[in-house]
Amino acid sequence: MVYRYLVKAYGVSLNKKVIYGQVSNCASAVTKPQTPKITSVKKDGTTKAAIQLKTERNVKGYQLYEYMWQTKKFKLVGKIEGKKYYKYDSKKKKFTRDRKSKVVQNAKKKTISVKITTNNVNFKRYRRYRFKVRSYVKYNGKQIFSKFSKQKIVTR
């Protein structure tokens, strides 16, 4: 949420007239978006996961992270903007549109669902896959991120 402020000083003269000063320059402040919530993560086939999360108001998009067992860290795997999903290429350090993954918005339940392909190459049958998400807004060309959601686990 963006807040803009203007300040104008005033005072009362001896003859009880109100005297106003000049208006200040516009000052603005941005609040971080709310922490998103992953409502469910389900397996979908052998290498896909269906992720559903609650939508937030005034949010530009969401970034999805997956836990990598090889590095023991969460890795950015993609982002959702509107009804589009973008995969993240860590070598090129940029997002590319993934036309295979469909984003479904449910206005009644206030949720977004997306099916993504997992990036873990060492796929094992009973391995757990962990996901977390954060939302962001854009302000003056910069992205302002929320806190990360609690991680959700799906067992393959």
Where are the predicted features?
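Beta-strand-rich modules
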Residues: M1-K16, N120-G141
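Recognizes extended acidic, P/S/T-rich segments that occur
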Residues: M1, Q63-K124
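Small side chains
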Residues: A9-G11, A29, A49, G61, ...
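Residue-level signal for short segments within beta-strands and strand-turn junctions
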Residues: A9-G11, T31, T47, E66-Q70, ...
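Short, surface-exposed beta-strand/loop patches at domain edges
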Residues: T111-S113, S135-Y136, K150-Q151, R156
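Exposed beta-strand and adjacent loop surfaces of beta-rich binding modules
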Residues: K48, V59-Q63, R128
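An aromatic-rich alpha-helical recognition segment common to small helix-rich domains
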Residues: Y5-A9, P36, I51-L53, L64, ...
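Pro/Thr/Ser/Gly-rich low-complexity, intrinsically disordered linker/stalk tracts
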Residues: K16-N58, K142-R156
